[in-house]
From Swiss-Prot:
GO terms for molecular function: ATP binding; glutamate-cysteine ligase activity; metal ion binding. Pfam families: Glu_cys_ligase (PF04262). This is Glutamate--cysteine ligase. PANTHER family: GLUTAMATE--CYSTEINE LIGASE. Its EC number is 6.3.2.2. InterPro entries: Gln_synth/guanido_kin_cat_dom, Glu_cys_ligase, Glut_cys_ligase. GO terms for cellular component: cytosol. Keywords: ATP-binding, Glutathione biosynthesis, Ligase, Nucleotide-binding. Transmembrane segments: none annotated. GO terms for biological process: glutathione biosynthetic process. HAMAP family: Glu_cys_ligase. The gene is gshA. It comes from Aliivibrio fischeri (strain MJ11) (Vibrio fischeri).
Amino acid sequence: MTEFINRLQKVASNPNAFKKTGRGIERETLRFTPGASLSTKPHPEGVGSALTHKYITTDFAESLLEFITPVSNDVDTVLKQLEDVHHYTVSHMGDEKLWPLSMPCFVTHDDDITLAQYGESNVGKLKTTYREGLKRRYGSVMQVISGVHFNFSFSTEFWDELFGEQSEDQRKESVSDAYFALIRNYYRFGWLIPYFFGASPALCSSFIQGRETSMDFESLGKTYYLPYATSLRLSDLGYTNDAQSNLKISLNSVNEYVDGLNKAIRTPSEEFAKIGLKEGDKHIQLNSNVLQIENELYAPIRPKRVAKSGERPSEALERDGVEYIEVRSLDVNPYSPIGVNEDQVRFLDMFLTWTVLSDSAPMNDSEMACWKDNWNKIIEKGRKPGLELKIGCQGERLTQKAWAERVFEDLLIIAKEMDRVNGDDAYQQTHKRLSAMIDDPELTISGRLLAETKAAGGIGVIGCKLAVEHRETHLAHQYRFYTKQELDTEVERSVQAQKEIEANDKLSFSEYLEEYFSYLK
């Protein structure tokens, strides 16, 4: 019996080990006008304060909405919550629509994009200044790429069965070590996510206007594409940061990770120092270090813990270890009105369970570089028949199909255990549908989207068509989890909460920044 099977049988002996898995979803999407341009309107007043609303906020830009679900133990519940907040928001957007693709179209210049605004409080100004810094460092167009983030945690019962009796400190350390083992395996095998769910094989020419690229694009009118690409969002064209490439933050333990993060937020950048900190009285970045704050660290997956008020993410991890992980490699699913579907959630349930129960040796920088090379191959040509990937750095190779089939043998065992606990066959059905995509790459989201893009004459045409369809779906939606009254109440609460924060400020913004960044001294 393999160690993986042994561990799986241990946790599966307790039905609540799987039933109490925690999941939350964050979905980003741009508002755009009937004339197919980026919205220049403020955040819709009818959905409350972007600073304080629990479920509806903004990301980089005022037009870049972000929908957030609370943590749920039920797959159906988390999707219902997402549907409800989409319906509520679209109902307050007039004739504007939500862009259904990860890569923006019709955006040609940084000046087209208004930074997200959070009011007059110091914390609100901090959020906007941070975004001003991102704009000056990397440009705004790159920052309005949309994605879906999946937050995931194993249950207390899962850890109880896996580790047995432990003291509180032992448990904290074991759980953190297990999550970092998962993260290392995610880098080794997570290329399966863009293979199945990558949804950006093509982009509007406006996105790369004036940008250098070594990619050998084919063109279709104003659309550029790579014939076998899966997720250009995850490529060098998407959200990457050259300044961060030298950070090499260790993923071997929570202490090493926190040390690396602390170093990064304290490392000065000559390049960013040239930007300056102020223009007149206006703050244009929070500081000139490699990372202004820890959230600037780009990663396809992050270890997380809910932070206390005033606590940095790394301080929360240092205090009590890893609580959950945030998967950040999902493109927006253009075929789902909410940007993600049940098969994706169920696949991640199975895959993340497999990554934590499988062996996961420590990883050095050179091994990480080899695994990242596999990701880049899948991102740029993942559907190419016979594409070979490295097995570590040893020179051995395996086709993406053969490797996916091997992983899926283990995932089927997990699917059967999860279905046994739940009394249905939902995970096995997901496994079956995705297995078909291993056999035929054109069934993947990127394969389907590229075929439809070619038939329609461009990616912008597809985006506009799907946006209209999804808007109709959202407007016709009936509440399935929340009530309208509950969401109305949250709007009122958020507006009041922002007013209270603004009224309670005692420091000037400059004083506030000095106090906020006192840890850098």
